[in-house]
């Protein structure tokens, strides 16, 4: 589990909605997705457990890390590599009582929150949103310049998320980050695999300082 790299193109899912859900996830991974997170705010726990177990298997087949959003119990029961938590979720200490895998933490636009997360054992932090996003309509929008300082505050992987697409992704050129997370930029695309491939190329350029 821990040898899987926390780096690159990070896909966060929509809520589960049927068989096509898995097809799109597989297409996205084959297009270049490096990390997968299952986020589902509407389905019953029994459905989410079934879906999370299926995604655990898919991610394992492709050798990529798989995270469950919000719920350490679900992550444990599904056999996921990690859980991702935000400000409305239990703190890292409580998560550790339930789940012993990787922990990703949303740190929004707060460098102190990122530092605290690292000290408590977070595996990575995720800053954002930096742009408007329809996926989380109540998400705050933060100043991208916070990324100029982020690497001085934390040594663990830094991801960015929120309203990122082929146009806005170029705004991250020149910043020291480890990966970029998207939802609609891939899953709402007409050709999911092609969208993932195009984003992956941009992500690789950014995290390797080629832009």
Swiss-Prot record:
CC cofactor note: Binds 1 Mg(2+) ion per subunit.
InterPro entries assigned to the protein according to its UniProt record, in alphabetical order: Aldolase_TIM (IPR013785), ThiamineP_synth_sf (IPR036206), ThiamineP_synth_TenI (IPR022998), TMP_synthase (IPR034291)
This enzyme's EC code(s): 2.5.1.3
One Pfam family it belongs to: TMP-TENI
UniProt GO BP: thiamine biosynthetic process; thiamine diphosphate biosynthetic process
Essential cofactor(s): Mg(2+)
Binding site for 2-[(2R,5Z)-2-carboxy-4-methylthiazol-5(2H)-ylidene]ethyl phosphate: 133-135, 163, 183-184
Any one GO cellular component localisation term in the record: cytoplasm
Recorded metabolic or biological pathway in which this protein acts: Cofactor biosynthesis; thiamine diphosphate biosynthesis; thiamine phosphate from 4-amino-2-methyl-5-diphosphomethylpyrimidine and 4-methyl-5-(2-phosphoethyl)-thiazole: step 1/1
Reactions this protein catalyses: 2-[(2R,5Z)-2-carboxy-4-methylthiazol-5(2H)-ylidene]ethyl phosphate + 4-amino-2-methyl-5-(diphosphooxymethyl)pyrimidine + 2 H(+) = thiamine phosphate + CO2 + diphosphate; 2-(2-carboxy-4-methylthiazol-5-yl)ethyl phosphate + 4-amino-2-methyl-5-(diphosphooxymethyl)pyrimidine + 2 H(+) = thiamine phosphate + CO2 + diphosphate; 4-methyl-5-(2-phosphooxyethyl)-thiazole + 4-amino-2-methyl-5-(diphosphooxymethyl)pyrimidine + H(+) = thiamine phosphate + diphosphate
UniProt binding sites for Mg(2+): 70, 89
Binding-site list for 4-amino-2-methyl-5-(diphosphooxymethyl)pyrimidine: 37-41, 69, 106, 136
Keywords recorded for this protein, A-Z: Magnesium, Metal-binding, Thiamine biosynthesis, Transferase
Family assignment from sequence similarity: Belongs to the thiamine-phosphate synthase family.
Function: Condenses 4-methyl-5-(beta-hydroxyethyl)thiazole monophosphate (THZ-P) and 2-methyl-4-amino-5-hydroxymethyl pyrimidine pyrophosphate (HMP-PP) to form thiamine monophosphate (TMP).
Protein name: Thiamine-phosphate synthase
Gene it is expressed from: thiE
């Amino acid at each position: 589990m821990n040898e899987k790299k926390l780096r690159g193109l990070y896909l966060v899912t929509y809520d589960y909605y049927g068989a096509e859900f898995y097809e799109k996830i597989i297409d996205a991974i084959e297009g270049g997705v490096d990390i997968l997170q299952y986020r589902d705010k509407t389905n019953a726990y029994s459905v989410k457990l079934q879906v999370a177990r299926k995604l655990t298997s898919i991610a394992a087949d492709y050798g990529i890390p798989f995270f469950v959003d919000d719920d350490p119990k679900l992550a444990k029961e599904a056999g996921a590599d990690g859980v991702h938590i935000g400000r409305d979720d239990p703190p890292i200490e409580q998560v550790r009582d339930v789940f012993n895998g990787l922990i990703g933490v949303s740190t929004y636009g707060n460098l102190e929150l990122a530092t605290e997360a690292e000290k408590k054992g977070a595996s990575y932090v995720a800053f954002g949103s930096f742009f408007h996003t329809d996926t989380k309509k109540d998400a705050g929008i933060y100043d991208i310049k916070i990324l100029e300082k982020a690497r001085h505050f934390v040594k663990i992987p830094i991801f960015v998320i929120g309203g990122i697409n082929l146009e806005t992704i170029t705004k991250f050129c020149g910043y020291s980050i480890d990966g970029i997370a998207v939802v609609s930029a891939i899953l709402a695309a007409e050709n999911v695999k092609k969208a993932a491939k195009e984003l992956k190329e941009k992500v690789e350029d950014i995290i390797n300082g080629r832009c």
